[in-house]
Amino acid sequence: MALAGLMTLPVIAGEASEPTAGDILQGINMFTPEDGDPAYKVKADEKYGTQWAVDAAYGYWNTNKAISGTNRHTNLFLVHAQLNQRLIENTVHGGTWLRAEFSGSWGLDRRSAKSGTWFTDGYANASGLHADALGPHEGVIPELAVMQYFNHKRACVIAGMVNLTNYFDAVSIANDSFSSFTNDGFINTTIVPLPDSNLGAVFQYELDDNDYVMLGVSRTGCESGDNPFTSDDINGYVVVGEWGHIFADGDATFRLNPFYQRLDVDFGDDRGEHKRSNWGLAASIEYAVNDMCTVYSRAGLARHDHIDGNAGELSVGANIKLIPSREDDFFGISYGIFKGAVNNYRGYPAYLSDEDGESHGNRREQVLELMYSFQVNDYLKFVPHFQYIKNPAYRDASSESICGVQAVFSF
């Protein structure tokens, strides 16, 4: 499961009088102040080249339906932390940095802590509950890499064990780990494969003050939490690109993401390894309409020849400040349609049951999410939310609803 990154490329606010070289890449990679981030403080240890950010949360979810033998609710403690540590200082070109990331979730009661009865098994919607809800007791290191800047901070290479969600499709109003839309389909694209915990590299280049390009290459065989040097269950790779354009005086950002994926699948029998490939294109746009409203939209299509995932997606969303005097509070609403892939990599139709191979309805799942972020102070916020899911996981024509609340502590 792809993990959401804490820091994303912001829609550059109009408060910056004149953009300078490297501003775009700094917005993607570094933990810098940004509009709408009240928890950020200039930490004293930054003068030593240390940047860090931590989100810790309590999350409770309840569904109106659950598969027999699974729990209808869950209590989770979630953590997401990221670190940038400067290794070699170079004030002109940006220097050399170490990037590290940790993410995990733990069940807080007896049933939530058992994988066999865990909550997500009770509804199994295709786009997932939350990118950081990994399991009842699971903590992983999705990224540990070296970051090197060049050319007056206009170019950068990140190499090592990379988490591609930290760089690509970084729609800022939908990609915050705990504060915005909590369905995976709204946090990240469901079209572009964005693995974490895999060996890879990302190249970034700032073309001018309004345009940038990125190219990422990563293995795809290592699941979150596994050792990328020893995991070889599914050998493959993915190549992801991004062109981004900032316009409307910095209030809007458009992103275009082409990708190609290749897998060598070992079925574990006399058939041996089978090569599977996939390619597609996704795009997103976000726009700060005014001080009270920011909107976004994301769409994508994929070929999906025997590869797990979605073949199509279209989602729209908005963050709206309903109470002008509460500058840090906002109401979020998002709606998405996700089309299932024709086949997964083992050769079964992805919208069918691997066990019985029978059809369970159409291949379109629809998700509506409503949430409200209530900022208590600079460090604590409460986020109640509601999801309505039609045709969950493409397995039937029924619907489900999920209610939840998160208490998020950021520092």
PLM regions with names:
Residues 57-61, 103-105, 162-164, 218-220, ...:
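Outer-membrane beta-barrel pore domains and translocons
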Residues 18-29, 41-65, 96-100, 108, ...:
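Transmembrane beta-strand segments of Gram-negative outer membrane beta-barrel proteins
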Residues 399-411:
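Outer-membrane beta-barrel "beta-signal"
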Residues 18-23, 153-157, 184-295, 299-303, ...:
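Signature for the C-terminal beta-barrel architecture of outer-membrane proteins
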Residues 14-18, 30-52, 84-98, 151-154, ...:
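Short loop/turn motifs that connect adjacent beta-strands in outer-membrane beta-barrel proteins
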Residues 76-220, 308, 312-347:
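Outer membrane beta-barrel
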Residues 242-244, 252, 257-275, 282-286, ...:
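Outer membrane beta-barrel transmembrane domains
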